[in-house]
């Protein structure tokens, strides 16, 4: 196993001592070491449930005979950061996310990795890292937010943006805007709609980096946790089979993703992210 380079042999006794400081026992030294990259935070609605998703992944890894270890990375909420100076930090965060996941996974010789993102730049950033690392990898996101219900009408975040203009134009009262503001985003999860997060989560399935329904099971459904547990089990299977992203992310896979992108009406930001992911495996999309 790849992790043997950090755990096996006489010269790795100090390394094993540090693993044992983490609570590892000798039996765990013989099992696949699975990293779990999480962008859990309390500032992004799409990420506030990721701790639950991570726990389900860990359970699945254990069930399949692996040893899970979690670590965190950053994330930016495009919705909160837009329309002020904060938006200038969003796209650069994608590169930092990819770099940070690569660094942790490489420095600690993980045998495989589970990527737990959810929002706009985090999903492609983690997929870029998976492609760059080329170790067995699987994506399981936090899932989309449920639609809101405002006075019996389905609503979402885009409706709140539109309502701001309606108030300025005199077509809506501030009281009506307040009611919409309070009801349009009713749960955790990536913003409801085919924005970048949901687009890239759907495309993660098409590219072959995620299990079916990763892009569509709502964040608040228990089915999301079941998928996370299954993903944890699957990564151990991928490690045993030696199935890495370079064997999955073919030119045909990217063409399929572009086709699905157009069929679903995905975010135009996919034009930024698909070529970046492809570049990590030496494929040019022009």
From Swiss-Prot:
Superkingdom per UniProt: Bacteria
Residues annotated as binding Mg(2+): 78, 120-121
Residues binding [2Fe-2S] cluster: 119, 191
Keyword vocabulary terms for this entry: 2Fe-2S, Amino-acid biosynthesis, Branched-chain amino acid biosynthesis, Iron, Iron-sulfur, Lyase, Magnesium, Metal-binding
Claim: Iron-sulfur is one of the keywords in the record: yes
Purpose: Functions in the biosynthesis of branched-chain amino acids. Catalyzes the dehydration of (2R,3R)-2,3-dihydroxy-3-methylpentanoate (2,3-dihydroxy-3-methylvalerate) into 2-oxo-3-methylpentanoate (2-oxo-3-methylvalerate) and of (2R)-2,3-dihydroxy-3-methylbutanoate (2,3-dihydroxyisovalerate) into 2-oxo-3-methylbutanoate (2-oxoisovalerate), the penultimate precursor to L-isoleucine and L-valine, respectively. Is specific for the (R) isomer of 2,3-dihydroxy-3-methylbutanoate, with no catalytic activity against the (S) isomer.
GO molecular function, one term: metal ion binding
Protein name, as recorded: Dihydroxy-acid dehydratase
Enzyme Commission number: 4.2.1.9
Subunit record text: Homodimer.
N6-carboxylysine: residues carrying this PTM: 121
Reactions mediated catalytically: (2R)-2,3-dihydroxy-3-methylbutanoate = 3-methyl-2-oxobutanoate + H2O; (2R,3R)-2,3-dihydroxy-3-methylpentanoate = (S)-3-methyl-2-oxopentanoate + H2O
Family indicated by similarity: Belongs to the IlvD/Edd family.
GO BP of this protein: isoleucine biosynthetic process; L-valine biosynthetic process
Coiled-coil regions listed: none
Root EC class: lyase
Pfam families: ILVD_EDD_N (PF00920)
Cofactor note: Binds 1 [2Fe-2S] cluster per subunit. This cluster acts as a Lewis acid cofactor.
Pathway the protein takes part in: Amino-acid biosynthesis; L-isoleucine biosynthesis; L-isoleucine from 2-oxobutanoate: step 3/4; Amino-acid biosynthesis; L-valine biosynthesis; L-valine from pyruvate: step 3/4
Needed cofactors: [2Fe-2S] cluster; Mg(2+)
């Amino acid at each position: 196993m790849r992790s043997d380079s950090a755990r096996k042999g006489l010269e790795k006794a100090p390394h094993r001592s540090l693993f044992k400081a983490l609570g590892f026992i000798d039996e765990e030294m013989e099992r696949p070491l699975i990293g779990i990259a999480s962008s859990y935070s309390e500032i992004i609605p799409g990420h506030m449930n990721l701790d639950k998703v991570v726990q389900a992944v860990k359970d699945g890894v254990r069930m399949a005979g692996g040893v899970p270890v979690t670590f965190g990375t950053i994330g930016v909420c495009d919705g909160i950061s837009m329309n002020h100076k904060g938006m200038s930090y969003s796209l650069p965060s994608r590169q930092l996310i990819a770099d940070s996941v690569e660094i942790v996974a490489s420095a600690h010789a993980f045998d495989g990795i589970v990527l737990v993102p959810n929002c706009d730049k985090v999903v492609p950033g983690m997929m870029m890292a998976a492609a760059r690392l080329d170790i067995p990898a699987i994506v399981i996101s936090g899932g989309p937010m449920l639609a809101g219900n405002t006075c019996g009408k389905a609503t979402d975040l885009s409706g709140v943006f539109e309502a701001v203009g309606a108030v300025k134009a005199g077509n809506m009262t501030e009281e009506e805007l307040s009611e919409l503001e309070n009801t349009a985003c009713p749960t955790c999860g990536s913003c409801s709609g085919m924005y970048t997060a949901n687009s890239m989560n759907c495309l993660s399935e098409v590219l072959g980096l995620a299990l079916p329904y990763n892009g569509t099971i709502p964040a608040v459904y228990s089915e999301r946790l079941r998928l996370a547990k299954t993903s944890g089990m699957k990564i151990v299977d991928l490690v045993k089979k030696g199935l890495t992203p370079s064997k999955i992310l073919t030119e045909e896979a990217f063409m399929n993703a572009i086709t699905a992108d157009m069929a679903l009406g995905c975010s135009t930001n996919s034009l930024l992210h698909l070529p970046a992911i492809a570049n990590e495996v030496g494929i040019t999309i022009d």
